[in-house]
């Protein structure tokens, strides 16, 4: 007993909270407390001290732990500030660098675009351009048009379109510089020149259609087989798809028919002498062409075949070709021999002649009638072909 009392007197009482032993609160809280190791907070970056745990007031915390925490918090504050500043600086520096790079890239892009636009503008300015000028005065010629447009820039070419009657009222002007062409178009479009309001537009490329060319024949015709069979049946008597015509091959050409079959078509063209006999030609022109259209009407006529006696006394009553018949068939249809006089030829033709269809025409009182020269198929056709038409476009 005495020894224990001595120990009690020698040892100082434990200071609550000094050695890490928590004190009992006045209410008698018997909850177990955590050890000092568990109370030590790890290294954190928050600037404020840790909150109290398990109801322990902050003023009774462990002193060295508080010092360490204070140092840590102070250090953390310093580090946090420096880190934040450094982070902001570091975060700002890449953005600044990126911004500078972006600015430089944008400037470079703008420079490239401006350079490209300038090059395009220079190319467009140096490209020639063609203008279409319409409704110009009919008396205008190329020098007049060049003088009108020459004030706006250098002109490479001037062309006014003409036909057989004169100017068609429009033309083309080609400028060396497209900018000059645009300026001329803006200034001159809609202006009145000698009472005519001219129109200036950009010329467009003409659309060319591929027309199917008709093969010209030896006599220069370009008729279709249907029309040609009416006006020249001797040219279309044999088809390339039919059997061979049994005439001499002296005046025939080989044509490749269907399936590679060669067909000989006799080329009996009016006005050309052939070595074939006159009787053969007459038979060819008259024997197998009964019921077809009449033979060729034109200035050049074939050699007349021999008269074939048949149906004497028949008068030709075709009203469509009557004018040609009554107007003097001998002078119109057949080329008479040079040895015969005109009177003899007229008398012989009026006495008896054939049209190549097996019909003989003898003298007729209507033959004495001589209508005006303007009547007839050939004359009327010549009027329409060569005459003036007020429906011409220009």
Curated annotation (Swiss-Prot):
It is found in: Nucleus; Cytoplasm. Coiled coil: none annotated. GO terms for cellular component: cytoplasm; nucleus. Residues 24-36, 83-103 have a biased composition (Polar residues). Residues 129-205 form the RRM domain. It comes from the Eukaryota. GO terms for molecular function: DNA-binding transcription factor binding; mRNA binding; RNA binding; transcription corepressor activity. The modification Omega-N-methylarginine is found at residues 285, 385, 390. The record marks 130, 138-139, 163, 168, 172, 196, 206 as: Interaction with RNA. SUPFAM superfamilies: RNA-binding domain, RBD. Residues 1-70, 83-135 are annotated as: Disordered. The modification Asymmetric dimethylarginine is found at residues 301, 333, 385, 390. CDD domains: RRM_FOX1_like. One of its GO terms (biological process) is estrogen receptor signaling pathway. Keywords: Cytoplasm, Methylation, mRNA processing, mRNA splicing, Nucleus, RNA-binding. Signal peptide: none annotated. Its main location: nucleus. Residues 105-125 have a biased composition (Low complexity). InterPro entries: Fox-1_C_dom, FOX1_RRM, Nucleotide-bd_a/b_plait_sf, RBD_domain_sf, RBFOX1-3, RBFOX1-like, RRM_dom. RNA-binding protein that regulates alternative splicing events by binding to 5'-UGCAUGU-3' elements. Prevents binding of U2AF2 to the 3'-splice site. Regulates alternative splicing of tissue-specific exons and of differentially spliced exons during erythropoiesis. Seems to act as a coregulatory factor of ER-alpha. Together with RNA binding proteins RBPMS and MBNL1/2, activates vascular smooth muscle cells alternative splicing events. Interacts with ER-alpha N-terminal activation domain. Interacts with RBPMS; the interaction allows cooperative assembly of stable cell-specific alternative splicing regulatory complexes. This is RNA binding protein fox-1 homolog 2. It comes from Bos taurus (Bovine).
């Amino acid at each position: 007993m005495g020894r224990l009392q001595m120990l009690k007197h020698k040892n100082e009482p434990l200071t609550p909270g000094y050695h890490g032993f928590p004190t009992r609160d006045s209410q008698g809280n018997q909850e177990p407390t955590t050890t000092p190791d568990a109370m030590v907070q790890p290294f954190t970056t928050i600037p404020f001290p840790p909150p109290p745990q398990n109801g322990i007031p902050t003023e009774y915390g462990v002193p060295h732990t508080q010092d360490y925490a204070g140092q840590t918090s102070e250090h953390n504050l310093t580090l946090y500030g420096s880190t934040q500043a450094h982070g902001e600086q570091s975060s700002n520096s890449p953005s600044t660098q990126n911004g500078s790079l972006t600015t430089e890239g944008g400037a470079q892009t703008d420079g490239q675009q401006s350079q490209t636009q300038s090059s395009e503008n220079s190319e467009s300015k140096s490209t020639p351009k063609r203008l279409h000028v319409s409704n110009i005065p009919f008396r205008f010629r190329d020098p007049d048009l060049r003088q009108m447009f020459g004030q706006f820039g250098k002109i490479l070419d001037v062309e006014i379109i003409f036909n057989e009657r004169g100017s068609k009222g429009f033309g083309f002007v080609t400028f060396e510089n497209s900018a000059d062409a645009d300026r001329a178009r803006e200034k001159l479009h809609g202006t009145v020149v000698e009472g005519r309001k001219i129109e200036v537009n950009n010329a467009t490329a003409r659309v060319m259609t591929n027309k199917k060319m008709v093969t010209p024949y030896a006599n220069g015709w370009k008729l279709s087989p249907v029309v040609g069979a009416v006006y020249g049946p001797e040219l279309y008597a044999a088809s390339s798809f039919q059997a061979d015509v049994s005439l001499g091959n002296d005046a025939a050409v080989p044509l490749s028919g269907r399936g590679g079959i060669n067909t000989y078509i006799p080329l009996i063209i009016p006005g050309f002498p052939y070595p074939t006999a006159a009787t053969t030609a007459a038979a060819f022109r008259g024997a197998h062409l009964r019921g077809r259209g009449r033979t060729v009407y034109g200035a050049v006529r074939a050699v007349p075949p021999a008269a074939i006696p048949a149906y004497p006394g028949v008068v030709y009553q075709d009203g469509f070709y009557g004018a040609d018949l009554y107007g003097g068939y001998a002078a119109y249809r057949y080329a008479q021999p040079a040895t015969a006089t005109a009177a003899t030829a007229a008398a012989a033709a009026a006495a008896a002649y054939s049209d190549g269809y097996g019909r003989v025409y003898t003298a007729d009182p209507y033959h004495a009638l001589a209508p005006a020269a303007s009547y007839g198929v050939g004359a009327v056709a010549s009027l329409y072909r060569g005459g003036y038409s007020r429906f011409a476009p220009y």
